[in-house]
């Protein structure tokens, strides 16, 4: 069995987690208390959904997940929420004082006290697996817990489970909307360890998702619940092939193999289609070519950067629902002829497609319409560097004056770590620039950097 353990860190990670598990439960017909009326074989572990749920002797299905936060309020909402009986109390780990938007607190002082407990819980989940495939890590890098404790956990997971793949779903600070003044510091420090300790990281950005909700779903003032439900659709589409059987299944390690040309170039853009409200869906037919075109639209990217400014190195298209390979091939052929979608010249094929016959589910009373077919795209595009250069610029403005740095140093960090992380990101921007440069023959010395 190829199990996956999900780790939700900090407020953002936990709230995205709530949306994801709500959706998984719907898709598999699992009730709020973990029972699954349709599952007649109690205790038999070969069902596909067992990659994400473990089954107890009494026929209860428990998510293979842990939720960690340095302060209790967000986790208390899970403890008292409608899915409180789904999780084992040991899976919900909360500390007493929060990281106060400070990477150093999350990584050194406060986080250090809780990280062993987390790893202990992860080990229990891992012992319960017959063939652990890897980890999905959910966090935001703007705050203190998601960035600090997030990177600490990733570093420790690399030590304990070196060969297992780690996929990150990481919420990056938005260009305009900011929830903390020190976001650029936390993001740069955290990305420094994401670079080394995740195999694939999918960048998400609230502002981009706000815009999608406003534009496509006609929600005037989107809430975090609206955003998270949209994010959960993407994550669900990515993991569909692990949880259901389909025509062309895609494994987690396959993402890595197909999307990551060089170890450091592993930050992905994601998009999903159709994002459409129930009123509109009634009048539209949404064929495979239509939704395929839609995921390549710059406006449907879940991070604020324009793929037309960069080149695609690879992309993964995950279709679900009423889709046959013939339609997919035709749609992909059309995309290849478009001038707006440019591939680097050293990667001519560039498409990996997966098809799953399980149609997309939607949360009842949610914003998305129930549709027959949907597609989720994860793409590796050199334009992602825009996200980093934006954050780097803000970092530089503050760091030039050493503003707010004393908060970090006071928690046991050294100033050198700032410049080290910043240099690492500068190198990353340069890597992206080189990868997108014309002509592959002058890049023979790529290998020395890693």
UniProtKB/Swiss-Prot annotation:
Listed under GO biological process in this entry are: microtubule cytoskeleton organization; mitotic cell cycle
Protein name as catalogued: Tubulin alpha-5 chain
Q: Where are the transmembrane segments?
A: none
Q: What's the top EC group for this one? A: hydrolase
Name its cellular compartments: Cytoplasm, Cytoskeleton
- Keyword flag Metal-binding: yes
Q: Which cofactor does it need?
A: Mg(2+)
The role this protein plays is: Tubulin is the major constituent of microtubules, a cylinder consisting of laterally associated linear protofilaments composed of alpha- and beta-tubulin heterodimers. Microtubules grow by the addition of GTP-tubulin dimers to the microtubule end, where a stabilizing cap forms. Below the cap, tubulin dimers are in GDP-bound state, owing to GTPase activity of alpha-tubulin.
List the SMART domains hit by this protein, alphabetically.
Answer: Tubulin (SM00864), Tubulin_C (SM00865)
Taxonomic superkingdom: Eukaryota
Please give the family membership noted in the entry: Belongs to the tubulin family.
GO molecular function per UniProt: GTP binding; hydrolase activity; metal ion binding; structural constituent of cytoskeleton
Q: What is its EC number?
A: 3.6.5.-
Q: Which residues bind GTP?
A: 11, 71, 144-145, 179, 206, 228
- Active site positions: 254
What species was this sequence derived from? Zea mays
Q: Which gene encodes it?
A: TUBA5
